[in-house]
Every structure is written in structure tokens, then in C-alpha cells.
Amino acid sequence: SSHDRMAAYINHFEKNDVFNSSAVAYYCGNRGVLTLDESDNPKDKALMDRLARIIQARRYLKYGIPMKNKTRVVAHRGFWHTDGSAQNSIASLLKADQLGVYGVEFDVWMASDGVPVLNHDGWHDGYEVQSTPSTVLTTLKLENGEPMPTLAQYLEAAKDTKVHLVLELKPHATPEAETAAAEAVVKMVGRYGLSKRVTYISFSLHIMKELARLAPAKTQLMYLGGGTLPKDLKAMGLTGCDFNYGVYLNNPTWLNDIKALKMASNVWTVNNPADMMWAIENRVDYITTDRPDLFLKLTRK
């Protein structure tokens, strides 16, 4: 019966506590239960990997069995998926620290008066961030009622936390503006004594090249765009690749390339437990997620 076939699949899956795709059986039309190495369809492995991760994620979440994990979690724009918090707020930083994540990602723009401020989008409440002075921007409210923070305020709060800081410097209107922003940010991070606790990321290759020039030696520098080969990023002086989940799926050799180059890997923005498990299984170094609480539930006792 179909029930017996499904039971055979589940029994085989649970027998292998750590997921091993080559050992998973599945039902294929009237052909009964097959193992993946018997399939003549090249898409079967990817399909079964997806299904098995879904089942395994539910099992871990339901029974509280932690996964074996070396992947570190970064809270995307802080831990804002909780009461009293908001994206890129100081509360989201403090709540992420209380949650026990490895790192907190946040977004930085340079206001028109040269003051770095935190915001994701280029506009907030009708004001273009890089064309507006910080004296105006800091009167604007976030969703939790906090004013838009300056980078100085954020770093001051971060001094009393243990989290690693993942600073995304947003692309600006001109290369000159990007250089000025990179110089201001690196200088400010150094002034607060946090240089060893900061990773810099950006979608702008110009910004990343400037950060490679400006940041202290051994600073983690990771590019967010997916259109440049890892080896070319390393040649620019970058130390890691911070790619969207889809980029890794579309370029299946890149993770191994990154490891061979002795670069760090990060995947974003992964909120689905099955996709989180993909990152863990593939030994991605860092995962950026809006649900760090869910990731920790998967991986902690």
C-alpha cells in the first residue's frame, strides 16, 4: 500500500540520524521504493534533498533534537522578529545579544552632513537618507518608536554586548561618496575600539575595494553580489563571499571554490528551516536570517 511505502521511506530516513541523501529511499510511480543511486533522473537527488530536509527540520523542531552544527548565525538587521524591536534599531542589537547569536548585521548610510546613520532603504518617511542631514534623520521614528540611530550611538551600545558586528555599507550615489563613507565608517569603528569585532559587507565592489585599502589587516571583508567569481574577489583583497542562497544553488561548485581559496562563506537571507539545514549540511560558515531564534532552536539542546 502507499502507507507501507511511505513508512518504508520514513523508517529508512530515521535510521540514518544524520541525513545522507544517497541512503534515502523514495516512491517513484509504479516502480515502488527505489534508492537514489537507482534513479535515472538527474533531478531526483536535488528533489529528495529538499524533501528530506523538510522532514528532518520538522523532526528536530518537534522533538528538540539539536543538529550537529558548525555554522554561526547572524541576525539580519538585528533580532527584530520580537516585541519591542525594529529593524536596524538599538533594541534589535540588544535583543540579538540576549538571544545568544554570533553576529548582528546592520545597514549604514552616510547622511548629507557626513554622519553615518542606520537604515536599510535609501528613503525613510519621505526623506532620501544620503541627501538629508542627520539632524533631520534622527528625528524620524522606527517601527518600535526609537529614533533612527546614528552609527556612533549604535557602536556605543555595541560596546556592552558580545556579538560580532556585520556592517553593511550601502551603495551611494557616486564613487566619491562611497569612498567618503568607507573612510568615515572605518575611522569611527576604530575610535570605538571595535575593529576586531567588525565584518564589512557591501553590494558595491568599489566600496569593498576601498574597505580593503582602509580596514586594519585581518579584517573580514565579504562581497554581497553574486556576479563575481570567488577567486576574483580574493584577488581584490577580500576575505569572504556573502551570497544569496540562490547564488550557491545556481553555482554548485562555488562553496568548494571558496573553501579551497581559504575564504569565508555566508548565505542570506535564509528563514526556512529546510534551507537552514542546507547551510549546515554544506558547512557554510555563517547564515544570515530574520529568524535567528528558529536557527538556534534547530541547533541547540
Question: Model segments located where?
Answer:
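Substrate-binding cleft of secreted/luminal carbohydrate-active enzymes
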Residues: S2-L47, D275, R283-I287
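Phosphate-group recognition and catalysis centered on beta-loop-alpha active-site segments
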Residues: K45-K301
